[in-house]
Amino acid sequence: MALTPAVNDINAWINFFCTAEIPVLKNTTLEIEQLKQDEDRLCARALTATIINDPMMVFRVLCYSQKNKSSHQLQDLVQVEQAVMMMGTTSFFKNIPTNFLVEEILENNPIALKHLLKLIHRAHRAAHFAADWATHLADLRAEEIHTAALLHDLAEMLMWCFSPEKMNIIHKMQEADKTIRSVTAQQNVLGFKLQDLQKALVEAFQLPPLLSKLMQDDASTEQRVRNVALAVNLARHSANGWSDAALPDDFHDISELLRIEINRVKRIVGAPELE
């Protein structure tokens, strides 16, 4: 494995990620290997069902698809199943190896692994919220919204993999002082904000422009972008329960997005009824 950057330089990290192999979850590798051995079950849909459980694997598939798209391909592929179908299962197994595991990288740092797995769980909740709301809004391409929400915090996931010590410091700072904003802690420890790393990462890997736009919180006046941003916020603020002070504002914003009552928003997202 290439040496991680010793300096707090966002460009150095982008250069590192561009040459580093992106790890995947152990369970992803096991399930894909099982499919590889089972010709009766092996198909693009079965592979997709496994891939979408792992944000880093989703990222790898979309990056490969974008980098190797045919000259006859008229549009970028944002949906994983479409990307797998276009490359075919033979090309998938040949060009996207899954033997570099998150659990091996963080074998000696179980605390970082715990935080990473929690972050991945949060990403899945955000993706579920976003896709559910997209359906409510009659968005015919809800899968694109799902993918954008799932990958919204990819940079943070990768930093937990490759810079767990610094990420642990950030976490401890925020645990010790709840008033410290995450971007402040990140700037102090890493020398940059993770949202800036995310933007640079998406640009460097040339992900589809649509996906990039859907993950841009600063463009959240547009309905689809706002959907993703609000889903990510809700998943973050409710990660440790439903008592976070930011949740009332989240519920209000979601009610405006969906054009429904706040009490109905709470029922839809599974928030408990408080006396």
Segments from the language model and where they lie:
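Conserved alpha-helical "signature site"
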Residues: M1-E165, Q186-P248, H252
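Post-HEXXH active-site segment of zinc metalloproteases
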Residues: P164-A176
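Substrate-binding clefts and substrate-entry loops adjacent to catalytic sites
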Residues: D177-Q186
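Terminal end segments
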Residues: H237-S243, N263-G270
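RNase H-like, two-metal
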Residues: L258-E261
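Extended, compositionally biased alpha-helical segments that mediate assembly or anchoring
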Residues: A271-E275
